[in-house]
């Protein structure tokens, strides 16, 4: 079974290969740790993000003994988890290795974010000696109780499967089940391995390859037919239907099928903000990002005036709904989940796979270009490009005009929580240009680790990472790991003196941060080892020069460009969004 054929920016797919005779491994290769390393590689992981600790050192020895598995040592566990998240976004699966409790509880926040984004991250923890379980002994790296299950209980809410390996006899089964569950459910899993077991051989690790247990999910044919019939009846009555792609297109592996329906139907196609990059933006009927009051120009008018809208894998939370202010009506909506379809707030059809539903619908839908023709009528091209005067302080809008010119199928964009969300949403992505951000969880600082992981998974692309100064202060250390591993990312550090997104939701003195010498910090981290170039820019002409240097002379280096802008220079979309989210947060308690 070959499980290493993974779609770019998607979830791992498993492909059956011709049966091969089982290979019997020698005892040195038949250890628990070597078995785990082989299974990770077979699942698609060729890099692991690690922080050593005394409980995982023997395990790390076994993992890195596999020449197909590359160890990426991180500065802290949180960033290791974020890196595994970013890696999974590109490769379809990622893995991190930390030590018991002090490492596990540190990585927990990153695993929660991966869970919210439906990413199969395999979190591996080096646990206590198997002989210490059930002895009432108190160990270091714990909270001082003889019960060692606190870490496990914390992970139970943010992983879809937990394996605690204290015995060699069932280790093979537990590890395989954990990895298979992560791939099947597209959620993180937790594997704890006792520190004294990793280097011990066992007969169950000696035969390989052994297929993963990955039963494919299929639609119930009757349910699929009923869902398609009900949907066609609803759509054929509509005058101006539209399509909107949501973030669960990824976990449903339905992006191609969604585009097939767009081609067949002629409907205008929009995406929710957290699905940007999932639909080709060069599609002839693409109209932009639907985000309520902060949508792409003319997009919300078309979506909200439609008499039928197909939402594919949406997540409607307070952020994506702009403080619950979307002007949508459930009775006009067809909501397509990964495994079910809801038609016009009425019947729900279960056991229906999203990809199969869209493909079947594409074969039978009646083309209708009315809504797209309406969009074409009201669309007004963008006006004259903004240009700063010489030595005039750089403005964010002018900056992103130059960023747009950098994009190609050989680049990818990582947008940090904050105003980068809104500025990067306005970028027009060429075909093949990657795009990632973390909207559901919105953990500031995520992008540093995610950039590390995504760039490691996709060395053929140059990653452009946009990070605010406040977010960067949370996780800055792992720029070190990027340099150490020869990555060629371009980081744009937006220095506006504080937590701008929080300012627009609710201002206060706590949103002002201590200014750092950011380029000086990165120079200190660089310390003459590896390839790294830094610069500060205050004016448009300096930005143009910096981009030219980064893309030509320093194209093989990590480039760190600190962009200094006024603290109040924010996108108009953030101003509108912030006021609505603030209003939603500030609602008084309901009467009792």
Curated annotation (Swiss-Prot):
Q: Which residues bind Mg(2+)?
A: 469, 496, 498
Enzyme nomenclature, EC number: 4.1.1.1
Cofactor(s), names only, from the UniProt record: a metal cation; thiamine diphosphate
Cofactor: how and how many bound: Binds 1 metal ion per subunit.
| Pfam families on file | TPP_enzyme_C, TPP_enzyme_M, TPP_enzyme_N
* Listed GO MF terms: magnesium ion binding; pyruvate decarboxylase activity; thiamine pyrophosphate binding
Q: How does it assemble?
A: Homotetramer.
Q: What is this protein called?
A: Pyruvate decarboxylase 3
Organism equals Arabidopsis thaliana
């Amino acid at each position: 079974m070959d499980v290493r054929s993974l779609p770019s920016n998607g979830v791992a797919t498993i492909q059956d290969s011709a049966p091969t005779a089982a290979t019997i491994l020698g005892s040195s290769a038949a250890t628990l740790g070597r078995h785990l390393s082989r299974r990770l590689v077979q699942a698609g992981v060729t890099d692991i993000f690690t922080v050593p600790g005394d409980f995982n050192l023997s395990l790390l020895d076994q993992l890195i003994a596999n020449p197909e598995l590359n160890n990426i040592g991180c500065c802290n566990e949180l960033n290791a988890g974020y890196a595994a998240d970013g890696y999974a976004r590109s490769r379809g699966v990622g893995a991190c290795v930390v030590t018991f409790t002090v490492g596990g509880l540190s990585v927990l926040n990153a695993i929660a974010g991966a869970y919210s984004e439906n990413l199969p991250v395999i979190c591996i923890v080096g646990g206590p000696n198997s002989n210490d379980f059930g002895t009432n002994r108190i160990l270091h790296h714990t909270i001082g109780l003889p019960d060692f299950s606190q870490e496990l209980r914390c992970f139970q809410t943010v992983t879809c499967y937990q394996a605690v390996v204290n015995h060699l006899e069932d280790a093979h089964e537990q590890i395989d089940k954990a990895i298979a569950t992560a791939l099947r459910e597209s959620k993180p899993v937790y594997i704890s391995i006792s520190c004294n077991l990793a280097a011990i051989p066992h007969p169950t690790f000696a035969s390989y390859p052994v297929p993963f247990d990955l039963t494919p999910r299929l639609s119930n044919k009757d349910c699929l037919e009923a869902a398609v019939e009900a949907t066609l009846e609803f759509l054929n009555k509509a005058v101006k239907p539209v399509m909107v792609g949501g973030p669960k297109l990824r976990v449903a592996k339905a992006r191609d099928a969604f585009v097939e329906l767009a081609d067949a139907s002629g409907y205008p196609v929009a995406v929710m903000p957290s699905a940007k990059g999932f639909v080709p933006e060069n599609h002839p009927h693409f109209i932009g990002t639907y985000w309520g009051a902060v949508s792409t120009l003319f997009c919300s008018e078309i979506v909200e005036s439609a008499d039928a809208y197909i939402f594919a894998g949406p997540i409607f939370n307070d952020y994506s709904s702009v403080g619950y202010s979307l002007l949508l009506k459930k009775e006009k909506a067809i909501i397509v989940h990964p495994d079910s379809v809801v038609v016009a707030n009425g019947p729900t059809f279960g056991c229906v796979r999203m990809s199969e539903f869209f493909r079947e619908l594409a074969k039978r839908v009646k083309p209708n270009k009315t809504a797209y023709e309406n969009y074409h009528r009201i669309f007004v091209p963008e006006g004259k490009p903004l240009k700063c005067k010489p030595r005039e302080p750089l403005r964010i809008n002018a900056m992103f005009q130059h960023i747009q010119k950098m994009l190609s199928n050989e680049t990818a964009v990582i947008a940090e929580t904050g105003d980068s969300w809104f500025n990067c949403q306005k970028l027009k992505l060429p075909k093949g240009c990657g795009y990632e951000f973390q909207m559901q969880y919105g953990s500031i600082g995520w992008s540093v680790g995610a950039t590390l992981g995504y760039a490691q998974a996709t060395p053929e692309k140059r990653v452009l990472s946009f990070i605010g100064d406040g977010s960067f202060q949370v996780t800055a250390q792992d720029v070190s790991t990027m340099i150490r591993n020869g990555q060629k990312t371009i980081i744009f550090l937006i220095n506006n003196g504080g937590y701008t997104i929080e300012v627009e939701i609710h201002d206060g003195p706590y949103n002002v941060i201590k200014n750092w010498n950011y380029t000086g910090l990165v120079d200190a981290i660089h310390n003459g080892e590896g390839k790294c170039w830094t610069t500060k820019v205050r004016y448009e002409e300096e930005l143009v020069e910096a981009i030219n240097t980064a893309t030509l002379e320093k194209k093989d280096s990590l480039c760190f460009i600190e962009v200094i802008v006024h603290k109040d220079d924010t996108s108009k979309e953030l101003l509108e969004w912030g006021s609505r989210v603030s209003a939603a947060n500030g609602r008084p308690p309901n009467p009792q």
